[in-house]
UniProtKB/Swiss-Prot annotation:
Protein's organism: Polynucleobacter necessarius subsp. necessarius (strain STIR1)
Gene Ontology biological process terms in this record: translation
Quaternary context: Part of the ribosomal stalk of the 50S ribosomal subunit. Interacts with L10 and the large rRNA to form the base of the stalk. L10 forms an elongated spine to which L12 dimers bind in a sequential fashion forming a multimeric L10(L12)X complex.
Top-level taxon of origin: Bacteria
Gene name of this polypeptide: rplK
CDD domains with a match to the protein in the record: Ribosomal_L11
One cellular component term from this protein's GO annotations in UniProt: cytosolic large ribosomal subunit
Transmembrane segments: none
Name assigned to this protein: Large ribosomal subunit protein uL11
Length: 143
């Protein structure tokens, strides 16, 4: 018989920097999970990634105090900002443009994000990424 699930915990943790301090410690502690075990497992799986890159993670907590976790791809906005080489998006996205990315860069981001997107095909995924970029005040060349 399958283990009884007592909850899901969604967090964004910097790659390689999970530690028992908030927000990780309290979120796992409330469910009675072993915080250090999660931190060690997460840091081991993210050591090959760029340090500090926020990684969304979904932790499934079971009734016997065990857990599993699934790591998602980094947020789209982080990838777009990195491609455009900017620190933050525009405070007024439709009037002030702060940078631009090419269609090739949008395709590269879409390829990386494809497992987490609901897009039916690659073209739809690229349009999704382009829309996110436009809402940040970044123009997409080739659209």
């Amino acid at each position: 018989m399958a283990k009884k699930i007592i909850g899901f915990i969604k967090l964004q943790i910097p790659a390689g920097k999970a530690n028992p301090s908030p927000p990780v410690g309290p979120a796992l502690g409330q469910r009675g999970l072993n915080i250090m075990e999660f931190c060690k497992a997460f840091n081991a799986q993210t050591q090959s990634m760029e340090p500090g890159l926020p990684i969304p993670v979904v932790i499934t907590a079971f009734a016997d105090k065990s857990f599993t976790f699934i790591m998602k791809t980094p947020p789209t906005t982080i990838m777009i900002k990195k491609a455009a080489k900017i620190e933050k998006g525009s405070p007024r996205p439709h009037t002030d443009k702060v940078g631009s990315i090419t269609r090739a860069q949008a395709e590269e981001i879409a390829k990386a994000k494809m497992p987490d997107l609901t897009a039916a095909d690659m073209d739809a995924a690229v349009r999704t990424i382009a829309g996110s970029a436009r809402s940040m005040g970044i123009t997409v060349e080739g659209f």
